């Protein structure tokens, strides 16, 4: 895992006291484009603060998109000039406007994606109003949840003079947006967890499972574990975790001594592989086993191991961020299990701010949209030719999800905490780093 050292950019996340404060309408500009409904503007803050409520991650994999067809029209060439004409509302005339285009699936056929987009839009709006500047223009564009829609939205973003593109969410949409944005070297801060779409100007703000696996394996190795086992699904998510797990174990000087997989999320398909894991335990005495599942599937999987005499008090159960779910924490077989996840202190601050502004829970990706605005505004302050370099600042950024810095290939390096499940609660046993050391 990367080492950390103190970073700068403290002004990026300058916060206003929200409570009963009133923020002038003229301070910021927000433009909603190609969306059936417009969020309230500006956000209204209740007088009495509301305590934040926990937000559980959605363990479902990223929805799949159809492959992008050949573009219907050629993308115009955009020059990398010092000043690009763009959309400027009348009240922002004469200012050095920083244009951030937010590409989200507002009209997706998926109700879940539409709800996610709505919460992310609110978080982005909140970030604009909390940033102490009068020169940020947020341009919201609808992708429809398709690659073709993302391509059209990215083209509209460039035509509006966007300095940075925020989004999209889905991997196919990110690839489509890259095809458009690459000619102008306009950076993209995307929300996909698929690391294969990173690079060529696209930087991922997400939490790839590979990073979580790397963190938890390093932690287990530091506690003396050197014999590891894998027990998970044959899904795309399971494959990614398995590959990352084997790599991390090898890099930390350990070995995989047992492994079993299954297809599906029903307990009946898990029973025989669980029996196999028990048999392998008797012969190899592995010290830790990773269970890359979440929700109902994990609550079905975990009890099978002690049922077949793999004792959680003797074998360390390891997980991924999918474990951070209150129902999972109540599963007795997972008591004592450990997994890696975002910095809880940073997330709590954001959740409280969002709750005060909107009186509701934020979605799973809302914090990433919030950070995207703050980072995007900082990047847009630089000359067009310097924006990639500003994004790849080795000092990184600290935001609503904790520490992040971007590698040159667009992949994120995250400062993750290690959690342990104790009597139905999540307890941080190894805090997330807040400083960056060593090369990126």
Map each language-model feature to its residues.
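C-terminal motif of bacterial Sec signal peptides marking the signal peptidase cleavage site
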Residues: 31-34
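Extracellular/periplasmic periplasmic-binding protein-like sensory domains
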Residues: 284-286, 302-370, 432
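Bacterial signal peptide processing site
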Residues: 36-39
């Amino acid at each position: 895992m990367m080492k950390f050292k103190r970073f700068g950019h403290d002004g990026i996340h300058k916060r206003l006291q929200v409570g009963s404060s009133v923020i002038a309408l003229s301070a910021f500009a927000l433009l909603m484009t190609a969306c059936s409904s417009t969020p309230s503007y500006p956000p209204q803050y209740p007088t009495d603060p509301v305590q934040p409520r926990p937000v559980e991650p959605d363990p479902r994999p990223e929805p799949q998109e159809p492959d992008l067809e050949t573009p219907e029209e050629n993308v115009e060439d955009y020059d990398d000039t010092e000043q690009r004409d763009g959309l400027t509302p009348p009240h922002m005339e004469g200012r050095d406007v920083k244009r951030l285009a937010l590409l989200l699936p507002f009209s997706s056929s998926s109700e879940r994606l539409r709800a996610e987009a709505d919460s992310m839009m609110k978080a982005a709006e909140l970030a604009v109003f909390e940033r102490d500047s009068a020169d940020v223009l947020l341009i919201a564009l609808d992708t429809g949840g398709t690659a073709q829609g993302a391509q059209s939205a990215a083209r509209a973003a460039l035509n509006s003079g966007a300095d940075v593109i925020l989004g999209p969410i889905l991997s196919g949409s990110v690839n489509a947006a890259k095809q458009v944005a690459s000619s102008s070297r306009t950076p993209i801060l995307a929300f996909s967890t698929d690391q294969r779409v990173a690079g060529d100007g696209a930087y991922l703000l997400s939490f790839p499972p590979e990073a979580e696996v790397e963190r938890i394996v390093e932690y287990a190795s530091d506690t003396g574990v050197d014999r590891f086992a894998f027990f998970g699904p044959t899904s795309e998510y399971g494959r990614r975790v398995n590959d990352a797990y084997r790599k991390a174990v090898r890099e930390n000087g350990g070995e995989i001594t047992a492994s079993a997989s299954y297809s599906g999320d029903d307990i009946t398909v898990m029973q025989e592989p669980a029996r196999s894991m028990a048999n392998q335990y008797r012969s190899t005495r592995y010290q830790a086993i990773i269970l890359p599942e979440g929700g109902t599937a994990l609550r079905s999987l975990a009890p099978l191991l002690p049922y077949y005499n793999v004792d959680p008090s003797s074998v360390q159960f390891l997980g991924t961020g999918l474990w951070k779910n209150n129902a999972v924490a109540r599963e007795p077989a997972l008591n004592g299990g450990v997994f890696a996840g975002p910095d809880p202190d940073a997330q709590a601050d954001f959740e409280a701010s969002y709750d005060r502004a909107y009186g509701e829970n934020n979605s799973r990706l809302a914090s990433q949209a919030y950070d995207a605005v703050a980072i995007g505004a900082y990047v847009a302050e630089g000359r067009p030719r310097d924006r990639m370099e500003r994004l790849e600042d080795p000092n990184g950024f600290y935001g609503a999800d904790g520490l992040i810095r971007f590698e040159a290939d667009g992949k994120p390096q995250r400062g993750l905490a290690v959690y342990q499940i104790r009597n139905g609660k999540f307890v941080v046993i190894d805090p997330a780093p807040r400083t960056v050391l060593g090369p990126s």
